[in-house]
From Swiss-Prot:
Its EC number is 3.5.4.16. GO terms for biological process: one-carbon metabolic process; tetrahydrobiopterin biosynthetic process; tetrahydrofolate biosynthetic process. It comes from Pseudomonas putida (strain ATCC 47054 / DSM 6125 / CFBP 8728 / NCIMB 11950 / KT2440). The gene is folE2. It catalyses: GTP + H2O = 7,8-dihydroneopterin 3'-triphosphate + formate + H(+). This is GTP cyclohydrolase 1 2.
Length: 186
């Protein structure tokens, strides 16, 4: 854990008028620094190391969907969490990605300061890169604490973002099948 990061959290406590020496806050700077490093550990990860060769030969050329992948990220504007789920689909062309690796790719990009729109795009292009799929579709649904806890304070709003590549973009029937499979009927 970065000692300087803990020192910055100490200064934040002072800056908001708290006493970092009171009993409940004595270890808070260290704990907050450790938590932030964990929440941003995606910067230290490499896509090909995350996938770790988990690509398997397959004759399947039908859609593969992994839906409801929980995700937690921090918005780059306020450093507040957004929490939701990702739905990832692709059309394989001879190779399929290990199931857990789809979730790990989501986590790798979610564990960075980001906006949801970019997160959606990064996941889609990463899956495309490692699988060489005929198409990739990603939909993310998330609640943003920066909108719930401050600003307009809207508790029930959900942001939905999507990125469609290849056949998911070019073929309405492929896109429609994906959206039906994840319960997003259009």
């Amino acid at each position: 854990m970065s000692h300087s990061l803990a020192e910055h959290y100490h200064e934040i406590l002072v800056g908001i008028g708290e006493n970092p020496q009171r009993e409940g806050l004595l270890d808070t700077p260290r704990r907050a620094a450790k938590a932030m490093q964990y929440l941003c550990n995606g910067y230290a990860q490499d896509l090909h190391e995350v996938v770790n060769g988990a690509l398997f030969e397959s004759e399947n050329d039908e859609m593969i969907v992994v839906r409801d992948i929980e995700l937690y990220s921090l918005c780059e504007h306020h450093m507040l969490p957004f929490i939701g789920k990702a739905h990832v689909a692709y059309l394989p062309t001879g190779r399929v990605l290990g199931l857990s690796k789809v979730a790990r790719v989501v986590d790798m990009f979610a564990r960075r300061l980001q906006i949801q729109e970019n997160l959606t795009r990064q996941i889609a292009y990463a899956v495309q890169e490692v699988t060489d799929a005929a198409g990739v579709g990603v939909v993310i649904e998330a609640k943003h604490m920066c909108m719930m806890m401050r600003g307009v304070e809207k508790q029930n709003s959900v942001m939905i973002s999507s990125v469609m590549l290849g056949a998911f973009r070019d073929a309405p029937s492929t896109r429609h099948e994906f959206l039906n499979l994840i319960g997003r009927h259009n």
